Amino acid sequence: MSEIQSLTERALADVAAAQTPDQLEALRVALLGKSGSITAQLKQLGTLPADQRKAAGEAINLSRDALTAALAERKNTLETAALDARLAGERIDVTLPGRRSERGGLHPVTRTLERIVEIFARLGYELSDGPEIEDDWHNFEALNFPPHHPARAMHDTFYFGDGRLLRTHTSGVQVRYMDAHKPPLHMIAAGKVYRSDSDQTHSPMFHQLEGLLVDEHSTFADLKGTLSEFVRAFFERDFEMRFRPSYFPFVEPGAEVDIAWQQPDGSTRWLEVLGCGMVHPNVLRNVGIDPERYTGFAFGLGVERFAMLRYGVNDLRAFFENDVRFLRQFA
C-alpha cells in the first residue's frame, strides 16, 4: 500500500502543476486510462494473497477517487482562468469615447411623396400600385391615345423587343383599378415612370402621382376644390391658382394648374405644378363604366417638381446623384 500512497502523492502533485487542459488530459490518461498506472494496480489485485486483496483494493479505490476529484477540480480551475483572461481581453472601457452611429434619413423625394400621399389619404383617396413594365393597352390605348400620338414614339418611350414598355405615367394603374372596382372610385397611384428626356428639370426616371375620382355627380368644380385644398395643405399656405386649358388624350376638358410663386427677389410669377381634367368618356367606356351615368376627374403631378419647390432645389438631377452632402441637408 505504500506504493499506492506514493503513486497517489506524486500524481496529485502533477495534477496541481498542470497548466493547460491538454496537460491535464494527458495525466488523466496516464493515471486512469486503460493502460494507466492506477488501472494497472487494479489488474494486479488478483496476484496478491487473499488476505491482502481487500485492503489493497480499498486503497486503490481511494486513490482513484482522489485523483478523479483532483483532475475535475484542476480542470475547473483552468477553465475559469481561461474565461477570466478572455473576458479581460474583451472588456469594454466605458470611460472611452463611444463611436456614434450615423443617423439615417429619408430621401427628400421619398419624404415629399409620403407627404402628398398622406394629404390625399385624408381626403379619402385610396393608394393603389401597378407594374412599371406595361403593355400598350394600359399605357396608351385604354387612355384614348391615338395611334399617331407622339408619346408613342421611340424617342419619347422606352420599348422592349416584345412590344412592352417602361410606363410613361402611372395612369395605367388607374385603368387597372377601374377594371377591378365599381364606382364610386377615389384612388391615387404613385411610383417611378420613365421617359426619354434628361436636362436640368427632366430625368429619364422620375416619380409621379396621379389621382382619379369617378362618381355620378363629379364636376370640374369638385376637381378645382380638391386641388386647391391639396396645394394649400402641401405648402401650408394659400396660393392664387389658375387653371389653363390644355390637351391630354385621357381627359376632356383638360387643364394645367399654375400657382403664383414668389421669387427670391420678391416678384411673383406663374408656375405650372399640375395637369388635370375630366375623364374622357372613351376612357370610361374602355373599362366598362357608363359615361352617361358616371363622370370623373383625374390629375397628375411630378413628385420631384414638388420636392424642388418645397426644399428650394433648382436642379432636378441633384436628387439622383447620391451626393451625401446634399442629401444630409434633408435627413
From Swiss-Prot:
PROSITE patterns: AA_TRNA_LIGASE_II. It is found in: Cytoplasm. Mg(2+) binds at residue 252. SUPFAM superfamilies: Class II aaRS and biotin synthetases, tRNA-binding arm. Binds 2 magnesium ions per tetramer. It catalyses: tRNA(Phe) + L-phenylalanine + ATP = L-phenylalanyl-tRNA(Phe) + AMP + diphosphate + H(+). Its EC number is 6.1.1.20. One of its GO terms (cellular component) is cytoplasm. One of its GO terms (biological process) is phenylalanyl-tRNA aminoacylation. GO terms for molecular function: ATP binding; magnesium ion binding; phenylalanine-tRNA ligase activity; tRNA binding. Gene3D superfamilies: Bira Bifunctional Protein, Domain 2. InterPro entries: aa-tRNA-synth_II, aa-tRNA-synth_II/BPL/LPL, Phe-tRNA_ligase_II_N, Phe_tRNA_ligase_alpha1_bac, Phenylalanyl-tRNA_Synthase, tRNA-bd_arm. Belongs to the class-II aminoacyl-tRNA synthetase family. Phe-tRNA synthetase alpha subunit type 1 subfamily. Tetramer of two alpha and two beta subunits. This is Phenylalanine--tRNA ligase alpha subunit. The gene is pheS.
